[in-house]
Amino acid sequence: MQPKFEKYQGLIFDMDGTLIDTMPAHVAAWQKTADEFGFDFDPTWLHSLGGMPSHKIVLEVNRRFGLELDPVLVSGFKMQQFAQSEVKGELIAITHQVLLDNMDDKKVAIGTGAQQQGAHELLKSRGVFDYFDAVVTATEVNNHKPFPDTFLLAAEQIKCEPSQCVVFEDTLLGLQAAHAAGMDCYLVTKSGFVFKPVTEAAFTE
């Protein structure tokens, strides 16, 4: 059964792993990048960084392994590998249905850690770009998830107060960003939605 969203004026969707199942393609791209630049690859750790732009993930790799990789060079290689993927991921049914059910009555936005060009191309390739009233990417903000900037800008662009918005996310970083923005959040899991109201934030994070 789908959740009800009467209390909200705006619905904000993360993209990778929430609306579109891109994680396998991202994992494969990072594996090739790790092989190319010679660092250990841990898919579970990578998933914990979901929502973080590629160049910042490289900084985390440097910090974790004591390396001095060039974030621009390495993230550029990774993004090229992802762009060359034949299958980037299909729409995730439960969140896609929420989008379809609510886009005529609510304001809907994307709030993603992906760069603008890649995000726009992916959304267009899946036929959903034009459904959104706003698309906020890593290109438009300086402070990325878990900071609230992505979701606050999305709320501003759809002309809703943060308290009027609910976020759909699949990672802890995204949940933290939603709560930092003063927004309720639905986590997308393999078994469905898990509601995480902002009132729980102080006790769980």
Where do the model's predicted regions map?
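Asp-based, Mg2+/Mn2+-dependent phosphohydrolase catalytic module
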Residues: M1-Q9, Q97-L100, K106-K107, Q115-E205
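Alpha-helical elements of Rossmann-like donor-binding domains used by nucleotide-donor carbohydrate transfer enzymes
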Residues: A28-K32, K56, E60, F77, ...
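Helix-loop "lid/cap" segments that line or gate small-molecule binding pockets
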Residues: T33-A34, P53-L67, L122, A155
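Structured helix-beta-strand junction loops
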Residues: M52, D104-D105
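Metal-dependent phosphoesterase signature
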Residues: E60-L100
